[in-house]
């Protein structure tokens, strides 16, 4: 089998621009394309959520991929598949649909109790089994199935159990990538026992009748990766930030490969971006001002000459720094900035953010929805981006931001350290801080604002940031070698 014929199937719960919740969506939007550039054939499978616009993304039905039977122990659910090409590529992307499971919801909520947990487990099991049933009907045999995060973690186990006797899957290898170790997919065992055969349930990673899907993936996969060497080092340890992954790796004697995320310049380049108000480059930055004006208009904030526009774009949870941001708002607003907060999640954080909108309507604005086009506008229009993460695997938002001349203020954790050079005298591409505290965040914002108001410091910093090289090339080469090693080439 030649290198050109090696086939990789990527499985994920989110792929940009169709659905974006975390940085995984951006990984899925760009990385498979770079793998094709390395000589592999790539395809993608994801759920067809109700919020995905068929017409906008040119999804179409595939007659031979309709009415696929998905057997879940004592019942059979039907699966239909739609297909389109990943934008700006020829990569076939398959959307698995069942009205009961995916009509209204856009994500697999990680809920561990009550009816929501039962429903979520049904979605997960249906999707994971559905991927393998779709491959059987399609007749396209991947050499490697590359699974991403806990919601795809059943596939390696299913291949070893329910599908072990299928000749079609003989010699198919599995790779599992951890993008967020703190989201592990913990659910009561009883919900899986309702849907899966005993041989599958016996292979679930289960402690005190609770299944851990992330650990289930680790237990059965043949190759394990994560999004940066620094984050891999963190996960190998026994600190709270490893979330138990290090212990499980030791028990399995499984190496964890850290591979730095990259950025696809075909999708993220302010000089050619069709989704922003006006394009710009280091040679002419006037367009960034126009994007700032439009972003302010969209967020219903007034224009303020000389006042920096600062943003926070993330899921509202403690690990991505939403609580720290909420605790810091008083000190941040006092530094004479305008702040846009884009995201959703923890209801207490949402409420606290809205209280500041009421108290400071000309300085603070919050928006939950973030389409692909709006994300591009936000990245282009902001001056500074806050990333006060407690834990960060690598992320890609800071790379997009720097490419668009938006300077990140980020906590020095995980892959952040490998992608942002801390600002110093005539050096740096962003601002890093160590302490996960109000003082750490607000103090580093103060440092950034001093540079912002300095006519020599700021333009030089922006130019350095925009000149950063975040190419996927080296990572794609490294992944290509991992794939070939896995296939015994």
From Swiss-Prot:
Reactions it catalyzes: [(1->4)-alpha-D-glucosyl](n) + ADP-alpha-D-glucose = [(1->4)-alpha-D-glucosyl](n+1) + ADP + H(+)
Gene3D superfamilies: Glycogen Phosphorylase B
BP GO annotations: glycogen biosynthetic process
Stored CDD domains: GT5_Glycogen_synthase_DULL1-like
Keywords annotated in UniProt: Glycogen biosynthesis, Glycosyltransferase, Transferase
Function comment: Synthesizes alpha-1,4-glucan chains using ADP-glucose.
Protein name in UniProt: Glycogen synthase
